[in-house]
């Protein structure tokens, strides 16, 4: 049986991999929701469903700023969990 530390490290590694799903050019963030040692949801930072999945505005000088509509990875993971669990 894996120790709690080993499992925590595993879940962190998975979150880092999930982050690669983000379309953000500035900051890719991933999150996993774990219950009783099992992953029950995953999420990454990005725009809400129905929005163009472009996370940044680009200034003429090339500076990128995050759009206000971008949802944090942990919020996306919780929203996905709520959607599949019926909010329970």
Predicted regions and their residues:
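Zinc-dependent deaminase catalytic domain
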Residues: 1-88
């Amino acid at each position: 049986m894996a120790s709690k530390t080993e499992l925590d490290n595993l879940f962190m590694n998975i979150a880092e991999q999930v982050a690669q799903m983000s379309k953000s050019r500035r900051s890719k963030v991933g999150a996993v929701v774990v219950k009783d040692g099992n992953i029950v949801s995953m999420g990454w930072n990005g725009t809400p469903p129905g929005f163009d999945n472009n996370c940044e505005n680009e200034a003429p000088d090339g500076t990128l700023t995050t759009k206000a509509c971008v949802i944090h990875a942990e919020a996306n993971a919780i929203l996905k969990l709520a959607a599949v669990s019926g909010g329970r």
